[in-house]
Amino acid sequence: MIRDVELAEEALSKKAGGPQGSRSCLCLSLFSFLLVAGATTLFCLLHFGVIGPQREEQSPTGLSINSPLVQTLRSSSQASINKPVAHVVANINAQGQLLWLDSCANALMANGVKLEDNQLVVPTDGLYLIYSQVLFRGQSCPSTPLFLTHTISRIAVSYQTKVNILSAIKSPCHRETPEWAEAKPWYEPIYQGGVFQLEKGDRLSAEINLPDYLDYAESGQVYFGIIAL
């Protein structure tokens, strides 16, 4: 019986190719295991996004941060941060004259613009938007014609002469209010704005002819400013 088993094992060993055949089977099994393990690992890495194409970050608006639109807006925003800008408001305590303030809550001075002698001083050459608004108010129309003027002037470093670059004139009263008639208040706003090529050191002023008629009842009604483009 034992001899028969030994003969059977010997025959099986010869059929399989002996010890070398067993070694080949072991190598094949090990290779198959490694192949399956590698494929499983690769699948997991791809599934969880560890490798492979990365998801694009998005801005709060839902646009990809790498899109041309977002890049353009970002560049424009960064460039605007360094551009000169100024917004000054009228001093409501300066009765009888128009004085500008740069140190109150609604005022803004940035990137080199200065307020000197009631004038804005331009820090760099370039195109600038210049703007200003005034608001006049009266209780009634006087017997003589009433003309209100608002002028923005420039004193250029190249020729040192005061030149009006924006000017407006209005007449709120077309006729005198009769003595027997009830006085009716009138309001007259004047807004001006334009784009100009300015030089470093240029001085800009915004002036009126009748400051006693300025209306300071509400903040933000009388202002003057420049923005580099």
From Swiss-Prot:
It is a single-pass type II membrane protein. Glycans are attached at residue 76. It is found in: Cell membrane. GO terms for biological process: extrinsic apoptotic signaling pathway via death domain receptors; immune response; necroptotic signaling pathway; negative regulation of protein-containing complex disassembly; positive regulation of apoptotic process; positive regulation of canonical NF-kappaB signal transduction; positive regulation of extrinsic apoptotic signaling pathway; positive regulation of JUN kinase activity. It comes from Cervus elaphus. GO terms for cellular component: cell surface; extracellular space; plasma membrane. GO terms for molecular function: cytokine activity; tumor necrosis factor receptor binding. The record marks 29-30, 34-35, 44-47, 72-73 as: Cleavage. Pfam families: TNF. Cytokine that binds to TNFRSF1A/TNFR1 and TNFRSF1B/TNFBR. It is mainly secreted by macrophages and can induce cell death of certain tumor cell lines. It is potent pyrogen causing fever by direct action or by stimulation of interleukin-1 secretion and is implicated in the induction of cachexia, Under certain conditions it can stimulate cell proliferation and induce cell differentiation. Induces insulin resistance in adipocytes via inhibition of insulin-induced IRS1 tyrosine phosphorylation and insulin-induced glucose uptake. The TNF intracellular domain (ICD) form induces IL12 production in dendritic cells. SMART domains: TNF (SM00207). Belongs to the tumor necrosis factor family. Its main location: membrane. Residues 84-229 form the THD domain. It comes from the Eukaryota. The keyword DNA-binding does not apply. Residues 52-229 are extracellular. Disulfide bonds join 141-173. This is Tumor necrosis factor. Homotrimer. Interacts with SPPL2B. The chain crosses the membrane at residues 31-51. A lipid is attached at residues 14-15 (N6-myristoyl lysine). Keywords: Cell membrane, Cytokine, Disulfide bond, Glycoprotein, Lipoprotein, Membrane, Myristate, Secreted, Signal-anchor, Transmembrane, Transmembrane helix. The soluble form derives from the membrane form by proteolytic processing. The membrane-bound form is further proteolytically processed by SPPL2A or SPPL2B through regulated intramembrane proteolysis producing TNF intracellular domains (ICD1 and ICD2) released in the cytosol and TNF C-domain 1 and C-domain 2 secreted into the extracellular space. The membrane form, but not the soluble form, is phosphorylated on serine residues. Dephosphorylation of the membrane form occurs by binding to soluble TNFRSF1A/TNFR1.
